[in-house]
Regions:
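Contiguous, well-ordered beta-strand patches that form the walls/edges
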Residues: 72-120
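N-terminal helix-cap/turn-to-beta initiation motif at the start of protein domains
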Residues: 23-37, 80
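C-terminal motif of bacterial Sec signal peptides marking the signal peptidase cleavage site
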Residues: 9-12
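Bacterial signal peptide processing site
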Residues: 14-16
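Tryptophan-anchored aromatic micro-motifs
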Residues: 32-47, 61-65
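Short, surface-exposed coil-to-beta transition loops
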Residues: 46-50, 74-78, 99-101, 121-125, ...
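Edge beta-strand at a domain terminus
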Residues: 100, 129-153
Length: 153
């Protein structure tokens, strides 16, 4: 009987460890380096893309992303980075859809983060990295990888 309890205890601990390894990031450095206005440098001809990041609190960042062609807005999205239920989430709000598409953080350090949503058609992965004065954003998974390069205004 004691042997059975020892074996069950071992498997119980082993299972718990595996579950912890697959959880999204719950505590981390804050992505304060994103705060400010950014302009895309590798845009399509005749287009200008911007991301305006605002730190509202230690647990909320708001983002307005938009693309102009001439003086017309041809693309727009609102994003929030929010710490909810002890997990960071990158929530994308698109026009015409009241529910956000959420990506959970899987990696974050002082100058980069990665968030993922395996259920989303495209993209499944979003990564932001700061190198010098350039912010690099890459969306991938479920379609072609797209690179966005930004400089702070």
């Amino acid at each position: 009987m004691a042997l059975v309890l020892i074996i069950l205890s071992f498997f119980s601990c082993k299972s718990s460890t595996n579950q912890q390894e697959s959880k999204p990031i719950t505590s981390s450095p804050r992505p304060d380096w994103l705060d400010g206005k950014w302009q895309r440098t590798n845009d399509e001809e005749n287009k200008k893309t911007y991301e305006h990041w605002q730190k509202v609190s230690d647990s909320l960042y708001l983002v307005l992303g938009f693309t102009l062609q001439q003086k017309d807005t041809v693309w727009k999205e609102n994003v929030q980075l929010i710490l909810k239920d002890s997990m960071w989430s990158y929530d994308v709000f698109m026009a015409g859809n009241p529910n956000p598409t959420s990506f959970l953080f899987t990696h974050i350090i002082d100058s980069s983060f990665v968030c993922e949503n395996a259920q989303n058609e495209f993209p499944k992965k979003i990564a932001y990295t700061l190198k010098g004065d350039t912010m690099r954003a890459v969306i991938s998974g479920g379609g072609p990888e797209i690179l966005y390069l930004f400089v702070k205004e």
